[in-house]
Amino acid sequence: MRRRTLLGAALAGAAVTPAFAFGTARAADPGPSVRRTGTTTLDSQAVFFVSYDGLVNNNSFQKNGLLTYKGYQYAAWYTADRNAVVARRVLGGTWSTVQVGHTLKADDSHNVISMGVSKVDGRLHLTMDSHSDGFTYVKSVAGLMDNPAGLSWTPARFGAPQSTLDGLALTTQFTYPQFVSTPEGRLQLSYRVAISGNGRNALAEYDGSQWTALGEWSSSTGTYTSEHGSSTARNMYLHGIDYDGNGRLHSFFTWREQNGAVMCNGGGITNHDTGYVYSDDRGRTWRNNAGTVVGTTGGSDKVAVTDTGLVVDALNPDHSLMNQESQATDSAGRPHAIISYVPGRFGQCTTNYVSDRTANGRAFHLRKNASGNWQKTEIPVPLNSSQRTKLVLDRYDNAYAIFPFGRIAAASAASGYTDWKILFDGSGLNAFGEVVIDESRVEADNVLSFMYQEKSSGTTPSALHVVDFALPA
């Protein structure tokens, strides 16, 4: 695979889309805007501890920690006494909360709760509390999500916690559960097998009667060589996994190498390159940007670092590139992502990824344009954090970047995403860091809704909230 030089990759990361670029929006389409419409409190005393520079209730890679379905919104978190709970409300109403029979086992921010809806039978599914070990799974009775007004919200609506998916064991080293609904209404579960730096991505699928393991689709093997050294093991970190309106499954990713010898300094992080793959057969086979098959789920040929045509934005491991950031697709089915790292103008070697990202990290909007080319625009907002930024597109394809601390920047499709500016500076939230976006609510009722937890110290519990912003009508 061709790779850019150290200097070239870093400078390319700081490149800005020319001002004459244009989007697909009509001139009459409104630009981006947000209007804060309300804040609700889920829990005045949610569990709080800082782990991996994040919180277990607010890791932006949760899919989903907050979701909307058929006029109701659902949220999941851990309380101060470590109980896993799930709440619901009719949109605009008050929250009702139930415990699901599980307590958080470790002070590890990876051990998030993720929710998904199987539209085929109206169940709510939850996986939780795992970091390269066993997971806990809970599902509701059938029809609960289809008739929320007619079915009471009680613990009896949920089955007992399980260590398998209804008997399907998957793996003893399970991390990063992400649920996604297929166009037919089946529910898929994306997860990592094994460990950071030596793991594989896999899929399972629920058809309304049973779970099936579709298998692994990314490879941990092969040799990657940087300017500094080589690595023979890695894992693929997904920026997301999402179906567009035409049924194509998209995934941006970055690689994390096992061997720190690929870095200029051991205080950095071995993430490198932004890659992209897609699937037109519900995740069974994967294609690179050119349309060439590069992997088969459950087969011997998996997506590997040595495959050509995967990298859509090259960057070596010396710039503290973040993993598991964010992605979305626009109304034409074109993929967009947010990636972030320390641009080359701040130096060619990060030595402490937390402090360097906090001091000099920047987020970039990466997208495929109408011509099929990849464009990248630096968002002129300092991260002021080591953490992740989330991406949302409104009905007019305007882009919104939700930064740590709940700050919102946006750019118009009409400008070709060159007019980024802050719309909300996070004032009054007192948010700790990353926020959890309700991706489904943007489509459901044109509201940007996100969950955030207030700052605290030590292990002192703090309040967990949901804030709502109206987007352009």
Task: Report each predicted region and the residues it spans.
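N-terminal export signals
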Residues: 5-24
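Extracellular, repeat-based ectodomains that mediate carbohydrate processing or recognition
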Residues: 30-473
